[in-house]
Amino acid sequence: MEYQRAIDSIEECLNKQLRLSSEKVDQYVLIENWTSLVGHLKTLHSLISNYTNGRELQNEISSLLKQDKELDLQIQDCMREMTSIYDTHLPKTVSGRKRQKVNAETLLDYGRKLSKFSSAPPGYNPETGQDAKAPVHYPWPSEDQMRKTLLFQFSTSMVPNLSATASQLFSEQPPKTNEPTETETEIDANKAVEEKTKMNYPASPTFTTQEENKEVESPANKDVFAGFDLFDPEMEEDF
């Protein structure tokens, strides 16, 4: 559009110049026509120069696009090669790898974090199994617990046979009477002896020696565990 407009303007100025030349006009009119013609020629020249620059830029763009395509092809080739290297040189599975051994100290530290206690319980001796100063917990109930049970009450109110069982003790319970029995009288006598000797019995009978047990032994202290096969730590020490 701009080229056509510039060319039309130039043709119009030339036709006007021919017409003015045939006519007798003032020279200022001719100079003005020539000035406009020169301006249109400059415009056409600038358009032509711009067109030339555009062609050069287009050629450069074409060359750059060509280089871009070539670089894309090179990148694709490099990616294919990298993929092939990954498939051939790196292991496909991790099952064949050697597993690293864990140190024992690491396992112990981890176990201390998970466990309730980080060390052995107080009073524990690996050689004897229990410290001499620590309280001993036997698998049978203590004397205080036995005094509060029905088994002790039945044993103090009647004299069972050596082969009597717990069910027989419950079934052979005599009827209760308001009069004190012989066993209750013996228990009162036993309490009087304990007050005189001022001895405090511990929670477990194993803490008292045999001599002390002999001093306070009375007819009321019957063998409650008669007929029962229980573990005795004193017999274990003899062996």
Swiss-Prot record:
GO terms for biological process: positive regulation of transcription initiation by RNA polymerase II; regulation of transcription by RNA polymerase II. One of its GO terms (molecular function) is transcription coactivator activity. Residues 168-221 are annotated as: Disordered. It comes from the Eukaryota. Component of the Mediator complex. Signal peptide: none annotated. This is Mediator of RNA polymerase II transcription subunit 4. Residues 188-198 have a biased composition (Basic and acidic residues). The lineage of its organism: Eukaryota, Fungi, Dikarya, Ascomycota, Taphrinomycotina.
